[in-house]
A protein has these predicted regions:
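DNA major-groove recognition helix of helix-turn-helix
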Residues: 35, 53, 61-64
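Short, charged recognition helix plus adjacent turn
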Residues: 8, 12, 61-68
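Short basic helix-loop element that most often maps to the first helix and adjoining turn
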Residues: 4-23
Length: 68
């Protein structure tokens, strides 16, 4: 499940859920639901996260194991 990668990327970059939520302009609880897989994350937010983490949307959603 790709939400595990959201968590791992956030932790690897020493960021909090609040920092990511602020970056995405959503509230922390909404982002936490994305990260736990409770709520589906919009494609526009996946793109922003891929840009933030300097990776691809394909990596985040599990279509590749190549981080870059």
């Amino acid at each position: 499940m790709f939400f595990k990668r959201l968590y791992d990327l956030r932790i690897d970059n020493d960021l909090t859920q609040q920092q990511i939520a602020d970056y995405l302009t959503c509230n922390r609880q909404v982002y936490a639901r994305y990260e736990r897989g409770i709520r589906e994350i919009p494609v526009s937010m996946l793109i922003k996260l891929a840009d933030l983490y300097n990776t691809s949307v394909d990596y985040i959603v599990g279509r590749t194991n190549n981080v870059k």
